[in-house]
Amino acid sequence: MIAIYPGSFDPITLGHLDIIERGDRLFEKVIVAVLCNPSKSPIFSLEKRVAQIRRCTQHLPNVEVASFTGLTTDYARQRNAGVLLRGLRVLSDFEKELQMAHTNKTLWDNIETVFLATSNEYSFLSSSVVKEIAKFGGSVDHLVPDNVAEDLYQWYKVHPPQVSPPTIMPTPQPFIEG
């Protein structure tokens, strides 16, 4: 079965990549469908986002990256995909995604939505959070693939923070009178 994982991916995060990698194991093919949404103002062009995702998914044999405009259900029908893959971080995501799944079902009866709970380490992560951290010069190296982190630092004209390893202090020894 073919699954579509739609989104704006501006930028792709390690949370997105986690869903893609898990989808790769579950489905015959996963199409990461990068949405061209005229109502959004992405920092990266559509072509740049597609290239970023292709670079960080090249190790996944069943993943294809493409862009689309219009309704996700129309795109799924064109690509013979029967599943929309969605990640859920928190309860509010579920409410929004469930409503969207019902709406998509009214648009095309043959589409199903499969929800994957995000891994714990990514439950707080969103593209908006990543952009905010990068904008103010914080490190996003642990939140996005390396190529995307470099692109973010260039976009915001900040230098990647130099993170030094933590200082290990010797454990104090108890004072023993002798």
From Swiss-Prot:
Top EC class, one word? transferase
Residues annotated as binding ATP: S8, F9, H16, G87, L88, R89, E97, Y122, S123, F124, L125, S126, S127, S128
In its UniProt record, which GO terms are filed under biological process?
coenzyme A biosynthetic process
Q: What is its EC number?
A: 2.7.7.3
Q: How does it assemble?
A: Homohexamer.
GO CC aspect terms: cytoplasm
Pathway given in the UniProt record? Cofactor biosynthesis; coenzyme A biosynthesis; CoA from (R)-pantothenate: step 4/5
**Family, as annotated:** Belongs to the bacterial CoaD family.
Question: What domain of life is recorded for the organism?
Answer: Bacteria
Q: Which HAMAP family match?
A: PPAT_bact
Among CDD domains, the record links this protein to:
PPAT (cd02163)
| Keyword list, A-Z | ATP-binding, Coenzyme A biosynthesis, Cytoplasm, Magnesium, Nucleotide-binding, Nucleotidyltransferase, Transferase
Q: What is this protein called?
A: Phosphopantetheine adenylyltransferase
Which PANTHER family is this protein grouped with? Answer: PHOSPHOPANTETHEINE ADENYLYLTRANSFERASE (PTHR21342:SF1)
For this protein, the record's Pfam families field holds:
CTP_transf_like (PF01467)
| Localisation | Cytoplasm
Q: Which residues bind substrate?
A: S8, K40, T72, R86
Site for Transition state stabilizer, residues: H16
GO MF annotation, one: pantetheine-phosphate adenylyltransferase activity
- Needed cofactors: Mg(2+)
Question: Record's NCBIfam families?
Answer: coaD_prev_kdtB, cyt_tran_rel
Q: Which reaction does it catalyse?
A: (R)-4'-phosphopantetheine + ATP + H(+) = 3'-dephospho-CoA + diphosphate
Please give the function described in this protein's UniProt entry: Reversibly transfers an adenylyl group from ATP to 4'-phosphopantetheine, yielding dephospho-CoA (dPCoA) and pyrophosphate.
